[in-house]
A protein has these predicted regions:
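A structural "domain/chain start" motif
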Residues: 29-98, 208-232
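Sec-exported extracytoplasmic/periplasmic mature domains
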Residues: 105, 109-113, 139, 202-210
Length: 232
């Protein structure tokens, strides 16, 4: 049997190799190229206002929240019945725990009641640390086609920086109904529910150290995790 490829001129062998390479790349184009339109990126943008509390003299470091793997993502979560899923082709600008940390820092800054606040990664000289656990940050559907209710549930702990003692703990649960069953309306509901949660967290946190020093603060045990009701 004649082995043609072994005796072909170099130029022709190059053509065959090049043609084969093009065929391989053509067959893989669906794998290495874009599979569809890029996801729409949405900004978490709640409104912040000055807190209706007395100013404080201590400084605060805000830790990134603990979160389950299902919430530690930039995807926008939805809950229908017993199923946790995500909106297609929609993303937050960052993973949800990082967004929560950044927005809490911003909320304390815009409260105008605290001299210094920063993320723990910024190595601020803090008197207290705000630790959080993110339990819910999702759009919850009670019906197949109706507009969802956004649920934000954050457990907050104020911790003494010097002794690492938990001064107080509170569970903040906020909800907001979307006006319509579309992504912009759902994002608006996230902004509303998250904004209310941040405002409550700021007001409560600013009052805790003063209560601790006066002896009236009562540390509260972290409440048990909420169990989602499943559709019957």
């Amino acid at each position: 049997m004649t082995k043609y490829s072994a005796h072909l001129p170099l130029s022709r062998r190059g053509i065959l190799v090049g043609t084969a390479s093009l065929l391989v790349l053509s067959g893989c184009s669906g794998l290495i190229g874009p599979s569809g339109p890029p996801p729409q990126i949405y900004v978490l943008q709640p409104e912040f206002h000055a807190a209706d509390t007395p100013p404080v003299r201590w400084q605060l470091a805000v830790a990134a929240p603990d979160a389950s793997e299902s919430l530690d993502t930039a995807r926008i979560a939805l809950h229908r019945g017993a199923n946790l899923d995500y909106f297609a082709d929609a993303r937050w600008t960052d993973a949800v725990p990082m967004l929560i940390q950044a927005k809490l820092v911003e909320a304390f800054e815009k409260s105008t009641k605290i001299p210094a606040v920063a993320a723990t990664s910024d190595a601020v000289r803090a008197d207290y640390v705000l630790e959080t656990t993110l339990r819910d940050f999702e759009a919850r559907y009670d019906s197949q086609n109706g507009a969802p209710t956004v649920v934000v549930d954050i457990v907050v702990r104020v911790v003494s920086e010097g002794h690492s003692d938990v001064v107080a703990t509170h569970d903040f649960h906020n909800e907001a109904s979307a006006a319509r069953n579309d992504i912009p309306s759902v994002v608006a509901a996230f902004n509303q529910a998250a904004g209310a949660a941040f405002a409550d967290i700021v007001a409560w946190s600013l009052s805790v150290p003063a209560a601790e020093k006066s002896g009236s603060a009562t540390p509260v045990a972290t409440p048990p995790a909420r169990r989602h009701k499943t559709a019957s």
